[in-house]
């Protein structure tokens, strides 16, 4: 529902010192293996290169959900940036090389969690955990947070740096239905909630068990498209230019 920015002293904000002039030659890298995030981008006319991050999320222990997803999103984007840089010699044939040419590319990292009754939840570990989670969630109001980190990597004399690093968090309130044990068990048996931070997929069968939401619906799916448009504008990229690639 609301948009949170990490405190200035905690967020690395480097002002853009170079401009992306030819978006048709600019690769957009998604530092996530999420099919839902990839699908959202493609539906909006952005065809991303998927290069998931290998960042170890257990390194980050924070209790504020907006700060947690922001830090994780940024670290995932940075890890992917470093990985691409290390492999750049092998990436020319598939187009990644453009990331580190004189035309900078874009790397998007994301992370989502559900906050419910003061607790923060990621993906459930197994079916038993998912069933227990849903028994807590039913009839309750949760807050789904997604962190977004947009990096513009640039190389200068062999040194890699982000010439812009934008980090934002978005929150959407989710009103869960009062559903039966039988419905919970049947839903978990589909396997769908096991792959979702909120233990449900708004774009799938989970939509049956959500009464309403307050805020950005794509944020619940894993990526706030309106927020992404705003972040791209901050680095002087008009999202519609991707349609011409």
Question: Where would I find each of the regions flagged by the language model?
Answer:
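Intrinsic-disorder-associated, low-complexity terminal segments enriched in Asp/Asn/His/Tyr and depleted
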Residues: 4, 9-10, 17
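Short, Lys/Arg-enriched N-terminal segments with co-localized hydrophobic residues
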Residues: 13-24
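Accessory recognition modules or surfaces
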Residues: 19-20, 61-62, 68
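N-terminal beta1-alpha1 ligand-phosphate binding loop
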Residues: 24-46
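Anionic-ligand binding patches
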Residues: 25-28, 66-245
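Cofactor-binding loop segments of dinucleotide-utilizing enzymes, especially the Rossmann-like FAD-
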Residues: 33, 53, 153
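Short glycine-rich, Thr/Ser-proximal phosphate-binding strand/loop in the N-terminal lobe
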Residues: 45-63, 162-171
